[in-house]
Amino acid sequence: MQENIIIRGVRQNNLKGFDLTLPRNKLIVFTGLSGCGKSSLAFDTLYAEGQRRYVESLSSYARQFLGQMEKPDVDSIDGLSPAISIDQKTTSKNPRSTVGTVTEIHDYLRLLYARVGVAHCPRCGREISKQTVDQMVDRLLALPERTRMQLLAPIVRGKKGEHVKILENVVKQGFVRVRIDGEICDAAEAPALAKQKKHNIEVVVDRLILREDIRARLTDSLETALSLSGGIVIADIGPGESEMLFSQNLACPECGISMEELAPRSFSFNSPFGACPTCAGLGVLQKIDPDLIVPDWGKSLNENPFNVMGWSNLEPGTQAGMFFQALSEKYGFSMDTPLNRLPKEALDVILYGSGGEPLNIHYTRPNGDSHTFSAPFEGVIPTTERRAAETQSDATKAYYDGLMSQTPCPDCRGKRLRPEILAVTVGGKSIADASDLSVIDAQAFFASLTFGEKDGMIAAPILKEINARLRFLIDVGLGYLTLSRAAGTLSGGEAQRIRLATQIGSSLVGVLYILDEPSIGLHQRDNARLIGTLKHLRDIGNTLIVVEHDEDTMLAADQIVDIGPGAGEHGGQLIAQGTAQEIMACPESITGAYLSGRRSIPVPLHRKTPAGWLAVRGARANNLKNIDVNIPLGVMAVVTGVSGSGKSSLVNEIIYKTLQRDLNRAHTRPGACDGIDGLEQLDKVIAIDQSPIGRTPRSNPATYTGLFDMIRKVFAATPEAKARGYKENRFSFNVRGGRCEACSGDGILRIEMHFLADIYVPCEVCKGKRYNRETLEVLYKGKSIADVLNMTVEEALDFFSAYPRITRKLQTLYDVGLGYIRLGQSSTTLSGGEAQRVKLATELSRTSTGKTFYVLDEPTTGLHIADCERLVRVLRQLAHGGNSVLIIEHNLDVIKACDYVIDLGPEGGSGGGTLVCEGTPEDICQCEKSYTGQYLAPVLKKSRRIESED
């Protein structure tokens, strides 16, 4: 096998056509500024080409079912292995995906419980075993005499196929009737079944009426049914009655509850055989939330307390007002009484209706005539639920979704499974109880299990697989997660490390792994364990390319590839390649300057004093342990702690959602807490994350920041535009008139290639300029609107120097390090760090009220340390304007530059959720219990200090 991966002439995106040789079976870090071309090289070139070559080796029939990747712009790549990408963008949002299912631990748990689980009666709790035919007969004869029933033998249960042979055998055996998917029909004339659908087929063995002398016939029929089905028989009692299921396998003799033979699918909440029928295995139900439709329970009906369409106006003449007036008369309460002081009965009627009982409603016509009619009151919540179910509008559905919240299923209490399945235990715990354990606790639980000789032989290989996967999760720093944790609630870093743990479990060799910042979301304490995992993958014979900015990972790498020197058009060059020491010695490498200590993020000489406080009382969302926390205002504050310590629960679930609800009037349901004091010091809350600034190629930095509106006004004010009668909308590529209609203003056309990836070509009519010829003839300072959109921020600053409002917005984009991006650059091509800085620039360009609360969740994701220095400067600007900045962060270089630190922990999961310490970074370093303080102290000690910009 070739010893190196040799890349020649790589020009993907902004890469400048350089050659690169990468050693195989090494740990290689790609680094450089945000937008320099790291991801273009790692993912868009190496991974894309590795994947493309694999897919092209398949048949054209197979290729149409796989996402075909575009051929990267590169002359050649030799020595390329099959590539596996582990990034942060493919987190599953499926509500059925959990940590257990993603890692396949749940699959092994299902097998374990099906093979060695002990079944119990879900009603009385006693251990249950197989039923005899005599017990079945006695149960049926206990029914009222003259009861009509039919005995059914299930021969197909939830299996796909046409089942022609099975039905032919039924006829040959002399049976006349079958029940197919709930419908009785003649066996000889059974309908053709859909091959791709799951079906249930039951043979009608006997139809009878219960009498005293029927025991012998009943016994014979039961034995026939049991032999046909393999031990299961259904007694169909008739319409309106529930069927009785009997099993030779498992049944409670006391309660008469029977269970089917336990199989792995019985323990799956994604299978109808195991899922709770009420919530379909989701564990939760979507319901209209009273707290979201009544933001303030201290308001009376006369103060219009309902924040929902149709109920927001309760004036006497409105339909809603008439109903509530009738309710107040019937139940004897005043329309001026606050809702939280109304009798429970009256409040229940207002919210949930009169239960069909009519009300006498008085109506006065405009001419003064009075009219009375009777009608039941449906209730605010049932009416809203009905309207949500009936609407066909996506926008209206989204509106009603905002009024709903998830509530635990009342039947399974959030456990997702049927009660009889939850009654099966191993080591005294149900499969749901075992899944609710953290990974660390689960490892201890499975290690403590003991079995008899037979069960021990069955369980041993299953437990070996479970324990191996649990150990891999602990090795990547995820020991605090529970196996039942929904995959959609994981951060990008957590999801990526789960996939990394899964890959370790697969034990593949000879593979090219490409990872995107695996250290994100990981506390410095757990870094060594993660690096050990990466080295293990390398040592068993794989090549690892890691896009990373973490100092520890770079120092542990066999080789570093530094791309730069700048970002966008100023990047895309190979600056340096070699060991960490060689990179440090390279004078052209910005990365080397920071690694060697020649450059660093400075620390303010004097920390800014808080201008006020938010007091969070009794925070207990998720694992928070009823803590009181004071959040400083007017400064740059950071919440720290190991992964799973409760940072996101405090900041995102409690603080941000409460401020959104109370300041921004948003439909949110904050995490559990007693309240937050001090909100009157703020006027709005804004979250600045790394999500794209737009989802389509039409959105760009100019449209997002509001620059494009101003630029269109400039063009509409030119003499040529006025002479032609062009208004501002003429210069929009989103509406008819000025845009090129051949491409609808996109500038590109999508060509569908069927068995190959779709390709995008410039529009032949406008040549990619988006506008028609007439619009492009209007010039300002010799440039058309298309020319302006193609300018960089740096070029536009000089071009629009006569317009202060435009230059102010452009200057903020330049100040946050985005001078290289083009005004019309598609938002889909911006990195997460670039998108975040566009949002920050937009905020900086606004007139500050000094009362804004900014929330940032790990803003350094994807940022080089030089980008982090610029980010800290921008955040300080926001704080120096009187605003408050609250960050969740693990990056020690950012933590040391903050004014105030709130450290949660001490551990993750159940071992976290407490306030370890709070104060300035210097105070945190003095706290012996703080892991953050232990790692922050040496970093703070060697940092240079500067005067604050106040």
Write out the residue ranges for each language-model feature.
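Conserved phosphate-binding elements of NTP-dependent enzyme cores
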Residues: 1-950
